[in-house]
Regions:
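Non-catalytic carbohydrate-binding regions of carbohydrate-active enzymes
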Residues: 111-121, 128-140, 174-218, 233-316
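Intrinsically disordered, low-complexity regions of eukaryotic proteins
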Residues: 7, 129, 143-146
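Aromatic-rich carbohydrate-recognition surfaces in CAZymes
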Residues: 1-126, 133-136, 152-167
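Short beta-alpha connecting loops at secondary-structure transitions
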Residues: 66, 141-150
């Protein structure tokens, strides 16, 4: 129930039509479904299942000692709370609520920094102690390591970048100038190190920033949707402060959206070069980002992809 992975995907619709549901979920996560590990605060994957709430601070999904499906999503759920809070606060103008969550925002920022590890490059290095020797996963847990592993993952790194921008935006509204400067600096640091992993020869980002996971993924772009919806579209503009990163992402998409890499034979999106598992909601989100945030005009790719995705739905 109230799976955070779904809340973040439904966020844009909910904030437009009934934003109070987002606020209630954010509050309930803080009050009953947050927890602290060796780093600091994070949030559970869900609040229970089959109409039964789980005990406080526990989900129905996450289990220790694992390295893939059913492990913890500590870093990603932390990002999800930050991003959802930023979008809700901006879309509603509810600064009263934002002020009531000042302490939570500071805790979230400190938690983000500690998960960065001993070498602060803005990219997640620390698996939660709740994993008990296992390792964290992402919402893409049913794919292979290219998207399933959270640590040093380019998809998670971009989400962390967006989360630092979100924290900077909320600290600016409060105002909390010192924290705003620190969050903005953390976003800059994250961008700089992500760009260092961009392969100039292959013209793409690797899935994992670990020197080994060189396969390509499409959702590396997913994080840049959020600044558009929390009032900082210039942060993800090709002509803005982070223009180098945006241009690199455009080059990445141009490179990987070809058959044999991140397109199936029928032209449908293949979220990972090395996994045949895809799902349509994430594909639609990436298509929107390509067309409306990156402003890429790719009619031949998109028209064929739309036809393929339609055929997937219509298959019996």
């Amino acid at each position: 129930m109230n799976t955070f992975d779904l809340l973040i995907d439904h966020l844009f619709f909910e904030c437009r039509y009934h934003p109070w549901t987002v606020r209630n979920a954010l509050d309930f996560f803080v009050e009953s479904y947050s927890y602290k590990d060796q780093c600091s605060i994070s949030f559970t994957h869900d609040m229970g299942s089959h109409y039964v709430f789980t005990p406080k601070g526990q989900s129905s999904y996450e289990i220790p000692y694992l390295t893939d499906c059913f492990s913890y999503m500590t870093q990603e759920q932390l990002c999800n709370w930050i991003l959802a809070a930023a979008v809700y606060a901006y879309r509603t103008g509810n600064t009263v609520w934002l002020r009531s969550r000042k302490e939570t925002l500071v805790e979230c920022f400190q938690s983000m920094q500690k998960r960065d590890g001993l070498i602060p490059d803005g990219i997640m290095d620390v698996d939660s102690s709740r994993c008990e020797g296992g390792s964290e996963i992402t919402t893409y847990d049913s794919l292979d390591v290219s998207l399933g592993q959270a640590r040093r993952n380019s998809y998670i790194a971009m989400k962390c970048f967006a989360s630092y921008l979100a924290l900077g935006s909320m600290f600016e509204q409060l105002p909390m100038e010192e924290y705003q400067e620190q969050a903005d600096s953390a976003a800059d640091n994250c961008e700089e190190h992500m760009l260092a992993y961009f392969d100039r020869k292959k013209k793409r980002f690797p899935a994992l920033f670990d020197g080994e996971g060189t396969m390509a993924i499409v959702p590396v772009i997913e994080g840049i949707i959020y600044p558009v919806f929390f009032g900082k579209p210039e942060a993800v503009s090709e002509d803005g402060k982070h223009g180098r990163l945006i241009r690199a992402l455009k080059e990445h998409i141009q490179t990987v959206l070809v058959p044999g890499i991140c397109l199936f034979e029928d032209g449908g999106f293949k979220l990972s070069e090395t996994s045949d598992n895809s799902w349509i909601s994430k594909i639609f989100l990436c298509q929107y980002i390509i067309e409306k945030v990156l402003h890429m005009n790719m009619p031949q790719v998109m028209d064929k992809a739309d036809a393929a995705h339609w055929s997937w739905w219509m298959e019996e």
